[in-house]
Every structure is written in C-alpha cells, then in structure tokens.
C-alpha cells in the first residue's frame, strides 16, 4: 500500500529517469532551427568540431545535446526520418549504459544512431550487435547513409568474410554484426600468432539489439572453436540400439520439469545385459572406471530419445541434424550440442555421425559482453528480466514511453481440456477473421505445431504463408505481406524480430519482391523501383485504412511459451505506432507448460465447474495461474543461468589471464606488478628502464628503417655522430613522408614489438623519437619477462628441494643439482651445497642462471634469443591451454559427485580449478626455459629460419589482404602508386641508419652475411 502511494506521488523509477532527461530533449529541440540553416558541408564539419572538443578534454556528456541535435538533423537529410522526442530519450538511456525497453514499431534501429554517433566520436569503435546476418547487413547499409553523411565510417561483420574484410570492418567507427561473429572473432584473435593479424580492437562500447534474446535466452550457449577429437562414432550407433528396449518408469525416470532423465536400478541391470550382448561392456559393472565412456554415451543416447524431439528441438535436413532455437524458432546454422549429445541425436536419427571434437577456445555470451567497457541494449521486452540484467550485467532497464498511445486489446486466455478441441477452435477463429479480411498472425512454439496448422488450412483450401525453420528463406517478404488484408501467417517465434508488420503491407519490400519475381535489380533501375514503391504505397495505405476499421492485426497464440517475454514479443507484433490490434491465446491442458506446471490446478477448476470438453474456460484467474507457472519457469531458468555463470566465472578469470599473457607476448610488452613481502600483487607496476646495450643495438636501426620506408629515401651522409640530427637534416631537404604501416610491420617482424605510431606520417622526428624510446624499452621488457620466469623456476626449485622446516643437511641437494642442470644446461659446483639458508641459495642460483643466459645471448644474439623465447612461449602456452580446457571439462563433469561427500561442488571446482591452472602455468614456464637453454647455435639458426618462414608467410598473406583491400578502394581508372626500389649504397658510404659507421661495417655487413 505504501509503495503504491509513493509511486502515485513520485512516479515509477522509469518515469523519474525520463523526467530527468526532459530538459536535454528540450535543449536539443531548441537547436533545431539553427541547424536547419546549415549547409550539408557545415553540418558534416560539426563532427570534426566535436572530436576536437573531446581531444581538448571535454566529455561525451558535455557534447551530448549538440551531437544528438546534429544527428537528428542529418537523419532528416540522409534518411528522410526525424527522431521523435521519445527516441531522443531512448538514445540517452543507451548512452548511459542502460537497457531501453521500447515497444514494437517505435524505431529502435533509428534510436541506436544517436549513441552510436556520439560514442564513435572517441575513435575507439562502437559495435551494434544484432540477432542475425540479415539485420546486420540491412542496418549497416540503411544507417550507414546517415553515418557517411556525418563523415563516419560503417562496417559489417558477417560469416564467411576474410581476415582483411574483418579487419577493415572493425577499424570502422561503427561496426554492425551478428552476436556469434563478435564472439568467434574474439576467440580467433586470441588464437593468432601475430598481433598484426588481430581483427578486433579493444572492446569498448556495444549496443545489443534484442538484448533479452542475446543476453538472457542465449546466455547458457557457449561459443566453442573446436579441433578434431577422438573417434567414437561407431560406439554411439551400437549403444543407441539399447534405448528402444528401455521403458519409462520401469527402466528410467523422466523429469520433464527439470529436463533430466536417469536410469533406475532395474534399468542399469537391463542396460548391462544388453550392452554385454553387443560386446560393448567390459566386465559386468557399468559403473566400473573402464566403462565410463560407455556409461556417458548411454546417458546421452537416453537423453536424445526422451528429452529431444524432432521438429521441436531439432530438425533433419540433407542428412544433418540441425538445432532449432527454442526462443526464435530459427535453425542455428553451424551449431552442435556438446559433450556427445549431438552424436547421440545423430545415432537416433540414423544419419552420419560426425566425430567428436576437442575444445580449442570457448566463451559464453555472458562473459563476452561483460568484457566491454560500456554496454547497453534495447528490446521490446526487458522489464520481466530486469533483476537478472542488473545482477549479471549491472544493466538497469528504463521503459521508454510510446510516441502514440497503445490501443491494442489483449484478451484473457482460452483454455480447453484437450489439444484436439483447442486446434478445432483455432482453425474456426482463423477462418472467421479471414472472412472479415482481418490479417492474422498465428504464433506456435515449434515447427511441428506450425506444420500441423498449415496442413489443416491447406486441406480447407485456405491460402496462407508459413514461417518456420523449414520455410525461412523469404522471411522478410513473408513478414512484409503479413499486414495485408485477409493475410494468414503461421509462424514459430521467429516471426520477423527486427521487421515491423505494417498494416496494408510494406510497400518497399513488396516492390523488391515484384522485382525479384521479374529477375530485376532495384540498384540497376532506381527510378523504376522508386516509381513502383510509390504506386504500391498508395495501394497499401488504402488497404491499411480498411484494416484499421476492422480491428487491425489479430495475434492468435496457440500455446504459451515458458517465458512471458516471448509471449509479449508475439503480442507486440500488433498495435505499432497507435494502430489498433487484438491478441488472444488458445491453450489446452495437454500443452507442455500447462501439463508440467499448471495443469492440475486448472483441470480441477474446470471439473468443479462441470465444463464439457469442447467448452473453454476464460477467466482472469486462469490467465493468472498460467503467468504464475511462467514465473516459476523463469525463476528456475534464472537460477540455472546464475549457477552456470558462477562455474564459468572460474574459467573466465583463467581465460583472461591466459589471453592477457598471450597478447602481451605478441605485442612485445611486459609490465608486471610489484609484489609485497608475502608475494601478493600490490597494484603498482614495476618500472623497467631500457638497457644501455639494447639501446645501442636498436637505435641505429631506427634511422635505417626511416630511410628505408620514406616515400623518397636518400642516404644521410652527415658524420657528426648525432643520429637524431642526421635524421633531421636529411628529412628537411625535401618534403617526405614515412610509410608507417610498412615500417610498423618491419619492426614487428624483426623485433616482435608492436608500436602504434599515432603521429602523422610527415612528423619524422616524432616518429624517430617514439621508436628510439619504445623499441629498446619493449625489448628490455621482453628480456625481463624471461628473467622473471627463471626467477620463479628457481624459487619453486628451492622451495621444493630445500624446505625451511628442514635443516640444510637434510635438503635434497641432488634435486637442486639435477633441476638446475635440466633447466639451464649448466653444472653447479659442489660448494653450492655449503650454503645454509634459502634466500642466499636462491640468489646464488639466480645469478648463475642469469650469467648462463647472458652467455647464450652472446652466442646467438639478443634479437634471436628473444624471438626464440617468444616462439617457444606461445607454442607451449597454446598447447597447455587446450589440454587445460579438456581437463576442466572433465573436472566439471564429475564435480557434482563431491556433494555426496558433504562438500560444496562449486567451492571444490573453484579450488581444484585454481590449483590445476597454477600447475599448468608453472609447467609452461618450466618447459619454455628448459627448451630455450637447450637450443644450441646451430639449432638456433634452424629455429630462426622456421620463425622467419612463418613470419614471411603471414607477412605475404597480410600484403595480399592489403592489396585486395586497397584495390577495392581505388577509384575507377586510378593507378596504384609505383613501388620504389631502395637506392643502392656504396660499401664505403655511411650507413643510412645514422650510426656514423661505414655501410659495410654496419647494416651492409648484415646483408652480406645473409646473402
């Protein structure tokens, strides 16, 4: 009562949030007359003006009002669409890192342009995440006109793109793409062997369209990049023969509510007998460790037969089992169930069984999107999941008011006793509304149900369209016609999310359909296409007015979904932009949701009222009962997702550590934290200064590279010894520019250092100073990483062999001598055994190891030594990480059994997973150092040749990508710039690197040696 009164006085949290934004909306409106006076060029110049303000210290909030006003004005000119005031509010909500709940037809696609434009001004990239490739392409092409008008670039990432296309798309200011692609590209980047091959930039800001579908419905779906695993396909087919001989309740217990099935004692005995007859069982006990794989396959085959239904959970097409998304009704192309379940379903359906795979990299959507520095989303249905959005993603939901009041009528549910009676009533209702000319969208929960209704309508001779996983090719065209007079569309939940159903029909899509039927292209005949659109638009407008008179679009739901959101999405197809509409659900006690969760209560109510089978019950109590059942399912699913997230957080922390380590190796940087006395990180970074020897080694190369990659290279002949002055004088002689990209690539290929030269190509001295400072520092950091690795190995060796609790005479000196020899290929003198305390021993061992490494550097050189170190480290890390993923999967599979020992499985998983990870990292360090010190000079040269060959291959591929990308961007008739040969240098001339030495004593000598 008190809460109700407070809301009445102060408004809901949504209303208060919107009130706070109103002054900014009014300020944007006041700017409109002034902006209308600007020319297109003046309006475009505002983008550069905003960027300059940000560079001078302004925040995005400081420029929000003018930026939104400019975006609105540009939209009017480029798209012929003006943002409503409520859309401006939606844009502010998205910019603030919240979820904007907007009704269907309120223009979410256009709303996203406001925060996209504002945040893209930072130059760090904005990702707009959609649910499918079609929407990504459509929105990028459509909204790209607006961004291009304002001087920003737009990219789109979809499946089947090459590396060059992906890199180009991610370098754009705004990038559209499907959720899976962003995830897989993140994983692929973290499997690459060169930082120059990365597609993505650091994840900065994402706007997730249909955020509930991606962050809630698909939260449990892991993205997995797999490699080939062990072969066991024949075993699935053999064990599958056992399942049809097992009976429910007698041999197994099926719990549909918990989505689980378990063998009974009698079922285990029967299975053992049948498996033995098939010669699959080893011994007589199914639970013997030697039969663990057999037991696992048996359980998966049992699940496949009892819990997974054809044309509901999956469909079979072209001899393949394709998963159907339970929330959208779409086929999930390329997806496979993990843990052998997909193979079990393939065995059940008697199609070719694909080999089991091995996980190479994996991440869930929950953890992927939490990597972004800022995240926001939009959908028509988020408020029912507001608690989960806040607890998992720290995202608040704000309900945006509609531009026009919603006048759709939502009727109470009709509940029948049997499914047969329900479908009879559904068909009668469809025919009745069809005769009136009212368009009808029939919503079903599965391919099976939509096909059944379609068959009945076909028998009655009623023309209709079907939209499901089997008939999805012309989805956009089907949805375009769904609002036409008398149209009947039978659809699963996929009913065109992202595509509005317009009363009277979508004129543009209908024109495209007509062109398609005539094998014509709109792009080839733009004037004819526009004329056709205008002609059809008149027809659609007149038809739309007629439909409004008879009640608008009629939504007929044939079953309640487990989630209220999915039902609300179906209802939301009608009543867009103030149009009339109707929605009603027809249910039966045999529906899955009713049968499992609410059937008994409603059945008792119907029996008490003495209602016949063919008469439905329609009452608010029944609707409330169904909603309560849905709430129970939603709460259960939330608990499942929350539990899975807690497990996945363990892997997430480990993944982040490995990927950060891998990335720092690839870019050639290392900045470790300072540790306290207990060995815990303090949060402060250790300061590493470049070694003088490395400075002297590297700096001559900077001048050499500048001469090599200048657009008009000449040889600096000054001999005053000041390299910087030599560079300055040489590049002052004429206006020259440096080919930064090629110079960066050369530095990376040779030294393994990725340097971002953000200065302009004509600022040669700044480039020289930056490279002269960063290259020696990065190489010193790489060397420091190796020394730290050696230090940790020695520390672990001393800790294990010489524990503080034992006197020195009881220490394992044999372990110390052997361990040092194995790791550093050096024999220790006998007098080491006279040292009596751990600290002194560790210091002595470290000094000897460091001297051994310095000797190794003298033999093979600093550059080659560090290149081999990086190569070995990446190789060992990747191999160990893949093995670790498999080990963690096995740990996860069996951890539930710890509960029988009165232990918390979750805590045990965290503890054991951490120990496994620490041991894995230590093992990698040990292997890397051992291999590095065992490399002799001859083998080092072979290693270098292999690394260089791999680098050249990647370099060539990158150049081919660059050429392909460059050629696409060349205007017609343009010629690419000619390649400039490097000028010949006489051996006695001064080396162009600026060292002051003769060429034949410096880099000329190197060329001779490698020729």
Curated annotation (Swiss-Prot):
Pfam families named in the record: P-loop_SecA, SecA_DEAD, SecA_PP_bind, SecA_SW
PROSITE patterns with a match to the protein in the record: SECA, SECA_MOTOR_DEAD
One GO process term, biological-process aspect: intracellular protein transmembrane transport
Cofactor: Zn(2+)
Subcellular location field: Cell inner membrane; Cytoplasm
Cofactor note text: May bind 1 zinc ion per subunit.
Coiled coil, from the record: none
E.C. number: 7.4.2.8
Key words of the record: ATP-binding, Cell inner membrane, Cell membrane, Cytoplasm, Membrane, Metal-binding, Nucleotide-binding, Protein transport, Translocase, Translocation, Transport, Zinc
Residue ranges, annotated region (Disordered): 969-1011
Catalytic activity: ATP + H2O + cellular proteinSide 1 = ADP + phosphate + cellular proteinSide 2
Gene3D superfamilies, alphabetized: Helical scaffold and wing domains of SecA, P-loop containing nucleotide triphosphate hydrolases, SecA, preprotein cross-linking domain
List of residues binding Zn(2+): 991, 993, 1002-1003
SUPFAM superfamilies, sorted: Helical scaffold and wing domains of SecA, P-loop containing nucleoside triphosphate hydrolases, Pre-protein crosslinking domain of SecA
GO annotations of cellular component type: cell envelope Sec protein transport complex; cytosol; plasma membrane
GO molecular function, a single term: ATP binding
Residues binding ATP, per UniProt: 87, 105-109, 500
Membrane topology of the entry: Peripheral membrane protein
Quaternary structure (record): Monomer and homodimer. Part of the essential Sec protein translocation apparatus which comprises SecA, SecYEG and auxiliary proteins SecDF-YajC and YidC.
Family per similarity comment: Belongs to the SecA family.
Role summary: Part of the Sec protein translocase complex. Interacts with the SecYEG preprotein conducting channel. Has a central role in coupling the hydrolysis of ATP to the transfer of proteins into and across the cell membrane, serving as an ATP-driven molecular motor driving the stepwise translocation of polypeptide chains across the membrane.
Record PANTHER family: CHLOROPLAST PROTEIN-TRANSPORTING ATPASE, SECA INNER MEMBRANE COMPONENT OF SEC PROTEIN SECRETION SYSTEM
Official protein name in the record: Protein translocase subunit SecA
Protein source organism: Sorangium cellulosum (strain So ce56)
